[in-house]
Amino acid sequence: MAAAAALSGAGAPPAGGGAGGGGSPPGGWAVARLEGREFEYLMKKRSVTIGRNSSQGSVDVSMGHSSFISRRHLEIFTPPGGGHSAAAPEPAQPRPDAGGDFYLRCLGKNGVFVDGVFQRRGAPPLQLPRVCTFRFPSTNIKITFTALSSEKREKQEAPESPVKPVQPHISPLTINIPDTMAHLISPLPSPTGTISAANSCPSSPRGAGSSGYKVGRVMPSDLSLMADNSQPENEKEASGGDSPKDDSKPPYSYAQLIVQAITMAPDKQLTLNGIYTHITKNYPYYRTADKGWQNSIRHNLSLNRYFIKVPRSQEEPGKGSFWRIDPASESKLVEQAFRKRRPRGVPCFRTPLGPLSSRSAPASPNHAGVLSAHSSGAQTPESLSREGSPAPLEPEPGASQPKLAVIQEARFAQSAPGSPLSSQPVLITVQRQLPPAIKPVTYTVATPVTTPTSQPPVVQTVHVVHQIPAVSVTSVAGLAPANTYTVAGQAVVTQAAVLAPPNPEPQENGDHREVRVKVEPVPAISPATLGAASRIIQTSQGTPVQTVTIVQQAPLGQHQLPIKTVTQNGAHVVPMPTAVHSQVNNAAASPLHMLATHASASASLPTKRQNGDQAEQPELKRVKAEDGESIVIALSVDAPPAAVREKAIQN
């Protein structure tokens, strides 16, 4: 590269054949400035050449060793003014205050772009505006030309000048790549010179492989270059110029470019060459880009079913077939022809459902957690779309019901291939409320009607209050001393007496349990009402009194007494027979059938003893029937206290 200092005296002969071409303005005034990526050149001569140094000679501004740049590529000159000669004490110098006395002549075979307008080799000299940009084709090498007027020469050293080597003011569209990252970037030269966010993400199928950026340091000159380009481009766009200034890659697919070209044709058809011409005319990016985009155009025309090939008639001159758009899809394609595509690298999905979403941040494959439905409530979109979350049931006012914690296992459906949530179970703890409390069940215990007694028989109703899930134990106290076991209907009805009143006693866990018994007198039951009973068994008066434990809560169905292995006096084992089922009169069994049904269908559940003694084996009850047969009845009973038992034996 040429040095940043101004060159004077040495250089190419003046263009246009004027005399005094080598002279310099008095005082070394700079009349123009050439600014590149890594250099700044102050023009103090009438003519300046730009190219690359070679054995055939040197140039004023060397642009390196790129093969796309000729040895003598550009020449910037000013015409001689006022017929001054070389011997004149004050040579003719450009009139920078005029602002339009600088011309450019293209000498290179590849031509040059001046503010996006191509200038070919051998074209007439182009009068330059006050500020313009040169770009060499097939490269991203740019030079900014700035004409310096007499009023601006004094401001040349001001800090606010954009050409001063100050710290770069990073623009939102500028990509600053450190030198240490240079080896990671593609070495291919970029066919476009505009560094923009849209161009940094290739939008065509071949964009990623056909273009790249040559890494260099971002200098203030690049920033001023983009700032200087913005005003002329906007002015020309406002004036309705045909040639767009933006030479960045257009955000359209190849199919969209083809549709644009065909629809803008007068007869709605174009040849392949006509499509190429339309694209290069409207999008300067494809003028200097790699020719691979033309192959993509041909492939789209051949493979896309929306494009129809129409042979050329023999009367029409030229060669090549025409291409048209399928009339059935023309309206839809034209509507989408100018719809800009989203640049690559921009996320096109949203994550509205938090961290468990399968697209946002997938959880670790080894992660399995327990979520509480009351605390977190986190769910995946898949679970929300397929089945609802189990909602907890609120307890009724005034009711204290125990709740059971149920752990359920749920597997989330797979939303994307390879999702780690598809194979790992997630446990959800759900609080479920048990069914409402069962109302108190009424048991009717009747004195035997076959026992001769002078006192009228008394029927007492016992209300048993239950609490879920514990099994209630109700003791009946205050009944007659006689113990009668009546086999009626489908079960065994038992009447017993408790010698000791129930008292609240501490249990193993420190809690107290209190048994509530409500006794209500009811009308006596006559022998006629129990006439349908199949068999009545009466025990003797001397039988020791036992305490009966009633186990509640079982569904109705086939009722049988539980079969147990019981011992009598700890000596031998007697099998437990099953109660005989028989038909019973509905009218007579209304009080007895209820107790028999619940007692026979109850499950055998362990209960705690109120007196805290060691559990003893249940005693076997042998009674004699009227016909002399013996029936063995096993009862889960609690033995009376020792003092009461001794007293009963003495009696």
UniProtKB/Swiss-Prot annotation:
Record region (Required for interaction with DVL2 and SUDS3): 120-162
Biased composition (Low complexity): 1-13
Region called Disordered, residue ranges: 1-29, 150-171, 194-251, 350-399, 601-623
Disulphide bridges, residue numbers: none
Residues engaged in binding Mg(2+): L301, S302, N304, F307
Principal cellular location given in the protein's record: nucleus
Key words, A-Z: Activator, Cytoplasm, DNA-binding, Isopeptide bond, Magnesium, Metal-binding, Methylation, Nucleus, Phosphoprotein, Repressor, Transcription, Transcription regulation, Ubl conjugation, Ubl conjugation pathway
Stored SMART domains: FH (SM00339), FHA (SM00240)
Keyword Transit peptide tagged: no
DNA-binding region: 249-344
Subunit relationships: Component of SIN3A-, but not SIN3B-, containing multiprotein complexes. Interacts with DVL1, DVL2 (when phosphorylated) and DVL3; the interaction induces DVL2 nuclear translocation. Interacts with SUDS3. Interacts with BAP1 (when phosphorylated); leading to recruit the PR-DUB complex and repress FOXK2 target genes. Accessory component of the polycomb repressive deubiquitinase (PR-DUB) complex, at least composed of BAP1, one of ASXL1, ASXL2 or (probably) ASXL3 and one of MBD5 or MBD6. The PR-DUB core associates with a number of accessory proteins, including FOXK1, FOXK2, KDM1B, HCFC1 and OGT.
Record remark: domains: The C-terminal part of the DNA-binding domain may contribute to DNA recognition specificity.
Name assigned to this protein: Forkhead box protein K2
Organism lineage string: Eukaryota, Metazoa, Chordata, Craniata, Vertebrata
